[in-house]
A protein has these predicted regions:
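Extended, low-complexity, intrinsically disordered C-terminal regulatory tails
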Residues: 25-53
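A general structural signal for well-ordered alpha-helical packing
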Residues: 21-24, 47, 68, 90
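Active-site-adjacent substructure of cysteine-protease-like catalytic cores
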Residues: 50-62
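Generic, ordered loop/turn and secondary-structure boundary motif
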Residues: 11-14, 42, 51, 80, ...
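Active-site acidic/histidine clusters and adjacent loop/turn architecture
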Residues: 1-36
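Catalytic cores and adjacent binding grooves of peptidoglycan-active enzymes
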Residues: 60-150
């Protein structure tokens, strides 16, 4: 589709596992939706702030050891938080993960495992996760920008 990561996004990948970086670099070339990297490696202090604010549900984040990235969707210079665009980014990440043979989990479908193995679309997998959480009487935690190595 002709998208490229900005220098800022490339900088955010510093310290991230090489296999995950390669998936992100492949996905930006495959995606229908432009995206940038907002988080790669995180310090313990950054993680604590996110945990305290409720924006993260764990202090054992894979960001702490370079095994996770957060990707934000762009339309021109505007950020989009619409879930459907993250489905598209996930589809590109899944194809890139297949090509690079890297197991990746998506933060909008925690229960669904490796994105390379999804049956159907990323949206289908997210909906399966939401249905599962609701059937358990639990609220789903949708972190659509988040992708982590398994």
């Amino acid at each position: 589709m002709g998208f490229k990561l900005s220098a800022r996004s490339i900088g955010k990948l510093e310290g991230v596992e090489k296999d995950l970086v390669n998936v992100v670099l492949e996905a930006i070339e495959l995606t229908k939706v432009d995206f940038g990297v907002t988080f790669g490696m995180r310090t313990l202090e950054e993680q604590q702030k996110l945990y305290d604010s409720g924006r993260s549900q764990t202090m054992k984040s894979k960001h702490l050891d370079g095994r996770a990235v957060d990707l934000v969707a762009y339309f021109g210079s505007d950020i989009s938080w619409e879930l459907n665009v993250y489905d598209d980014i996930c589809d590109a990440m899944a194809e890139a993960a297949r090509r690079k043979s890297v197991a990746i989990k998506w933060g909008a479908a925690w229960s669904e495992g490796d994105i390379r193995m999804y049956q159907g679309t990323a949206e289908d997998s997210m909906n399966a996760y939401i249905d599962l959480r609701r059937s358990e009487g639990r609220r789903p935690f949708i972190d659509a920008p988040h992708f982590e190595m398994m």
